[in-house]
């Protein structure tokens, strides 16, 4: 049971209603996470803009979904794991591959493996990474720009992880183990 108010689309007003309308057009529904974040419409707008900015970054959709899965696993966010297993499959990953990404162990692609290992280390050390972590990330083919974009992507998914953990958001995506 959610701890915070989950604003139903039919009950949304003002900026929240406008944002929900845009989300529904893009996704076909307004997920429970966004219905919760809608309690603070400016924050919802910022979160959506952050994701739109990341979509225009030099990181691919597959890379962004790998980040989302690895970080959500490290954070223990069942809601985001369910949502991003689905969107990870839409980005071309198999169920088995999404499980590997969650474990930050993706042996079939050194580039993606370097990415998920970097973000897991970033989250588990709270950003206090040894120099060799950054060097390994660069050696996996990532630029300084992508270091910054990756940290931005981590911050975006950590926000939704924390909202959903605090709220105990009801999962409205296919559940995963």
Across the structure, where does each feature detected by a protein language model lie?
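Hydrophobic alpha-helical segments
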Residues: 1-177
